[in-house]
């Protein structure tokens, strides 16, 4: 099993091209040469990568027009906002992206290389301590499913650990494909706790709450209150029950005492980038933002930096 995207950045273009081909022809069943294509990218995506994406869309797939948008900005649009800070955590990478009037502020974007795949690996490790063995890529998919179905974020980690130790109220059972039933207790909240305490994974980094706070502090003092009041969670690794309440508690502890803090956790958080893309593409003003095949032929791949920002 290979992953052409590492930490949110495409690293294997041949495989990525195969995935796009499969998406167009097998999943969407559309001819790419007949439709404009909106692609999304990670924050701080290298310039060469944006150019490569653009080149593949026009030269391999013959798209009539295309546009590249930053994922976090689309998530913010999906929440009905144009100003706010997005904590976007997917499978390979987590970013905090402050956005003002629709534009990401690159100097204040922070990246944390801790996301869904790391949490799945960690859950595999702590389930092994319980005597269950998960090692193969197939078994990793099972553990990912356990994670998505049973894990949650504790409001108070120490207190939750005490509860788990003194009673079986937090235990849940899960049936494996072979019919074996396993029981999982404090692992349910120990796994996503690593988002707040990366030291659990042996990482030096600060947690997602501090990363969000640090990102806000890199912004102009005049816009900070708009960011605190519009903190939007997005991506599959923000889908844990309890994550918004915990975030509210942690940011409140870090922020000035009078600050109004609002954490927005959309129920469809794992699709909010896609939803934001459909909003952007349906705006009446958007048609003049596309890069056309003609513009590409005249200017080459670097056109993407002039038209998509």
From Swiss-Prot:
Major subcellular location class: cytoplasm
Cellular localisation: Cytoplasm, Cytoskeleton
Protein name (database record): Actin-3
Pfam family, one: Actin
InterPro entries noted in UniProt: Actin, Actin/actin-like_CS, Actin_CS, ATPase_NBD
Domain of life of the source: Eukaryota
PANTHER family in UniProt: ACTIN (PTHR11937)
Recorded coiled-coil stretches: none
GO MF annotation: an example: hydrolase activity
Keywords recorded for this protein, A-Z: ATP-binding, Cytoplasm, Cytoskeleton, Hydrolase, Nucleotide-binding
Role summary: Actins are highly conserved proteins that are involved in various types of cell motility and are ubiquitously expressed in all eukaryotic cells.
Protein source organism: Echinococcus granulosus
């Amino acid at each position: 099993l290979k992953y052409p995207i590492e930490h949110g950045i495409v690293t294997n273009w041949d495989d990525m091209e195969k995935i796009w081909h499969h998406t167009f022809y097998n999943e969407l069943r559309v001819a790419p040469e007949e439709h404009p294509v909106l692609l999304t990218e990670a924050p701080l995506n290298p310039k060469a990568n944006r150019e490569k994406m653009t080149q593949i869309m026009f030269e391999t797939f013959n798209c009539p027009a295309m546009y590249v948008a930053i994922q976090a900005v689309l998530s913010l649009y999906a929440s009905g906002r144009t100003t706010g800070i997005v904590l976007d955590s997917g499978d390979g990478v987590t970013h905090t992206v402050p956005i003002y009037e629709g534009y990401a502020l690159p100097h204040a974007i922070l990246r944390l290389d801790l996301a869904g795949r790391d949490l799945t690996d960690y859950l595999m490790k702590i389930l092994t301590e319980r005597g269950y063995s998960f090692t193969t890529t197939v078994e990793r998919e099972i553990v990912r499913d356990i994670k998505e179905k049973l894990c949650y974020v504790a409001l108070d980690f120490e207190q939750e650990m005490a509860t788990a130790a003194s009673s079986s109220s937090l235990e849940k059972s899960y049936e494996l494909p072979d019919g074996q039933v396993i029981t999982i207790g404090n692992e349910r909240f120990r796994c996503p706790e690593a988002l707040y305490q990366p030291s659990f994974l042996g990482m030096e980094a600060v947690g997602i709450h501090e990363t969000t706070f640090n990102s806000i502090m890199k912004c102009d003092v005049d816009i900070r209150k708009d960011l605190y009041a519009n903190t939007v969670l997005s991506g599959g690794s923000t889908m844990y029950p309890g994550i918004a309440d915990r975030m509210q508690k942690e940011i409140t502890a870090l922020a000035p005492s009078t600050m109004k803090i609002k954490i927005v956790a959309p129920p469809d958080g794992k699709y909010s980038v896609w939803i934001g893309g459909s909003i952007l593409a349906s705006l009446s003003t958007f048609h003049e933002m596309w890069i056309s095949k003609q513009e590409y032929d005249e200017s080459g791949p670097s056109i993407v930096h002039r038209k998509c920002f």
